[in-house]
From Swiss-Prot:
Belongs to the CofC family. This is 2-phospho-L-lactate guanylyltransferase. Its EC number is 2.7.7.68. SUPFAM superfamilies: Nucleotide-diphospho-sugar transferases. One of its GO terms (biological process) is F420-0 metabolic process. Pathway: Cofactor biosynthesis; coenzyme F420 biosynthesis. It catalyses: (2S)-2-phospholactate + GTP + H(+) = (2S)-lactyl-2-diphospho-5'-guanosine + diphosphate. Guanylyltransferase that catalyzes the activation of (2S)-2-phospholactate (2-PL) as (2S)-lactyl-2-diphospho-5'-guanosine, via the condensation of 2-PL with GTP. It is involved in the biosynthesis of coenzyme F420, a hydride carrier cofactor. It comes from the Archaea. GO terms for molecular function: GTP binding; phospholactate guanylyltransferase activity. It is an enzyme of class 2 (transferase).
Amino acid sequence: MDVLVPFAAREPKTRLAGTLDADERAAFARAMLLDVCDAVEAAGGEPTVLATEPLAIEQPVVVDKRPLTPAIDAHLSPPAAVVMADVALVTPAALRRLFATTGDVVIAPGLGGGTNALVVRADGFTVDYHGTSVRDHRRAAEGAGIDARSVDSFRLAVDIDEPTDLAEVLLHGDGRSADWLKNAGFRLAETDGRTTVERRG
């Protein structure tokens, strides 16, 4: 299956600015992107990175500077999938399950109401990645008379946006993203019963 992996190459992951500087955020975002591409390939998909700037990586890259929604709509040709570049916990097994789920549209909701992955098999479906996109995608499918289904997956639900999300990468990740955090000095810590991260060195 063809898989678009959108990637904000310029100033990525700004919500991590209090934890990582600009160069570190760029390096960490790239590690997550490559983890996602590795998982897509291992699941039998063919990733194309939809980037806002040119990238020097092994996978095909299409540059589109437009906002996320029009950029994806312009390049999504069903049957195809969209997988966000910051679902650093994703595994080939989670993606194989997503790809195998029947339905004209298959949605993998993210925590907080986003859409972290999407399979589109029907022509005439347009994406909407603003606001509570999982709700908007369900409504769009219903309005178009398109069969939409959801996949409940922890590995696809967690996207890495906030400093507190970094703990999930160290707890559950085993790819480039987890290695990058460890090499940068991040370790798990407990604060008031909640697992967080701290940086040493």
